[in-house]
Design a protein with these regions (language model features):
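Soluble catalytic domains of enzymes that build or remodel membrane lipids, polysaccharides, and related
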Residues: 83-330
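Short, charge-rich amphipathic segments
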Residues: 34-50, 74-81, 110-122, 254
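Non-catalytic terminal accessory segments
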Residues: 1-66
Length: 330
């Protein structure tokens, strides 16, 4: 809640400042030309923009972040083994459990929706928590209820390494490492998920098989503070197979996967779709080459899920997402 209040105040101040900055620049230009420029409409613009932002924020906080869409995607590739024709993967990402406190029943509904899909595999692509491993407490039974034929596989996101925890007080590196270790153990033992830490799991159907590779967070862009991925280690033993990579940050795809490996499909999250999309427009492309949906290049593909949760608890237009991906051979 403290983080929410701080961010709300900061953004409100920025929004209110925009017309005033324009006014100062305009007045300076007018002064240089020997003219006078009154405050006039700039004052009204300040009030209007601030009021609009507050209304949008309230909408995004009260309603927007609790909406949900099921995005159905067909992924086609001739390399998919015959036995995996029609294989269904549900991808979820970026739960940020601190934002679900007090809304447990709604999260149960999301789990019920996912279970109703009757997927072959559920993939979670990171950011279970926002600040602390303690956020998981009370959600174990709910998230442990996720069911798929081949179970739930997961990777860590940048927030799951708790880099934003402890200000103040600062945690010692040893204490932080212990907290991360406990969170990883809780994901495995309390949720029953298969957590892939630079490793892989082979899924078999008769004589056919596919590899699901899980890489620890390897950010190559604006959030490059967490770089623990070891793709070579994670992919060991999967050579020549149809391969699906789970990696939290989509910048990893262009940084180390695309054109550098023969990994067919990568699933990522992290961007939240920037949590804002108005009239089909998002600030995402200003920061990320790939920020939402399916991308294909040179026979390799990336899907970016925009998450079910939020860091700042509001979403405007960027509706929380459950992805249902069906594998089809050409």
């Amino acid at each position: 809640m403290r983080f929410t209040i701080i961010m709300f105040v900061v953004i409100t101040l920025v929004v209110a400042a925009v017309p005033n900055i324009v006014f100062v620049v305009s007045r300076s230009v007018a002064w240089l030309r020997g003219r006078q420029l009154g405050y006039g409409w700039f004052g009204y613009a300040t009030l209007a923009m601030t009021a609009l932002w507050v209304m949008m924020f309230v909408y995004g906080m009260v309603w927007g972040r609790f909406e949900c869409k099921v995005a159905r995607v067909t992924y086609r590739n001739e390399a998919i083994p015959a036995a995996f024709e029609g294989y269904t993967i549900v991808q979820i990402s970026d739960l940020h459990l601190d934002g679900w406190r007090g809304h447990e029943e709604l999260l149960k509904e999301r789990v019920a929706t996912i279970n109703g899909i009757d997927a072959d595999l559920i993939c979670f692509t990171g950011d279970l928590v926002s600040l602390s491993r303690a956020e998981l407490h009370g959600f174990e039974e709910i998230l442990g209820g996720l069911k798929a034929k081949d179970g739930v596989v997961a990777v860590m996101g940048n927030h799951d390494y708790l880099p934003y925890d402890g200000l103040p007080p600062l945690r010692s590196p040893r204490s932080k490492a212990k907290e991360i270790e406990i969170l990883q153990r809780d994901i495995t033992d309390r949720l029953g998920w298969r957590l892939l830490l630079n490793e892989n799991v082979i899924i078999r159907r008769g004589n056919d098989s596919i590899a699901v590779i899980g890489c620890e967070n390897q950010s190559m862009g604006v959030h490059s503070v967490i770089r623990r991925g070891n793709l070579k280690k994670a992919a060991t033993g999967t050579e020549g197979m149809f391969r699906i990579l789970l990696t939290h940050d989509p910048t990893h795809w262009r940084g180390e996967v695309l054109g550098k490996t023969d990994i067919h499909l990568t699933l990522s999250g992290h961007t939240h779709g920037m949590q804002v999309k108005l009239f089909g427009l998002s600030p995402g492309p200003l920061i990320y080459s790939e920020y939402e949906g399916l991308y294909s290049e040179g026979g390799q593909s990336l899907y970016v899920n925009i998450g079910l949760g939020a860091t700042m608890p509001m979403r405007i237009g960027a509706t929380p997402e459950i992805t249902v991906m069906r594998l089809i051979r050409f």
